[in-house]
Amino acid sequence: MTQASSQRAVYWGTGRRKTAVARVRLVPGTGKIIINDRPGDQYLQYQEALLASVKGPLEILGLENSYDILVRAHGGGVHGQADAIKLGVARALCEVDPANRGPLKVEGYLKRDPRAVERKKYGLRKARKAPQYSKR
């Protein structure tokens, strides 16, 4: 047995938000973020807030320059995908070391946001908007 077999090199985490799904791989590295084969800042349209939210779980644990983040994301929009990636990174960090779970849970990084678009109902114009009521 080699040392590599006892210490895994790749950690997986899945995150979801609205209709976005992100499969996140954490690989020991220098802190690069690659989303769908593109640099993270380019994929997230150079929005610093989104990049910061993706890096959030790593920064809480002081590991921002210890792992490369490799992501396959689909569905939803840029914001939904960024939140899905954030959850996936947090779940992967829990795989790295179960002791990471406590600080991530306190900061709320392990919560899956359940809000999604409500379906349209028949007889209504939208999910809750009804046609104008006429008494006579």
From Swiss-Prot:
Q: Which UniProt keywords apply?
A: Ribonucleoprotein, Ribosomal protein
User: Where are the coiled-coil regions?
Assistant: none
Q: Does the keyword Zinc apply?
A: no
PROSITE patterns assigned to the protein according to its UniProt record, in alphabetical order = RIBOSOMAL_S9
GO cellular component, alphabetical, reads:
cytoplasm; small ribosomal subunit
Specify the superkingdom: Bacteria
- What InterPro entries does the record tag this protein with? Ribosomal_Su5_D2-typ_SF, Ribosomal_uS9, Ribosomal_uS9_bac/plastid, Ribosomal_uS9_CS, Ribsml_uS5_D2-typ_fold_subgr
GO molecular function ontology, one term from the record: structural constituent of ribosome
Q: Name one GO biological process term.
A: translation
Q: Which Pfam families match?
A: Ribosomal_S9
What NCBIfam families does the annotation carry? PRK00132.1 (NF001099)
- Entry-linked HAMAP family: Ribosomal_uS9_B
Q: Which family does it belong to?
A: Belongs to the universal ribosomal protein uS9 family.
Protein name from the UniProt record: Small ribosomal subunit protein uS9
* Native source organism of the sequence: Synechococcus sp. (strain JA-2-3B'a(2-13))
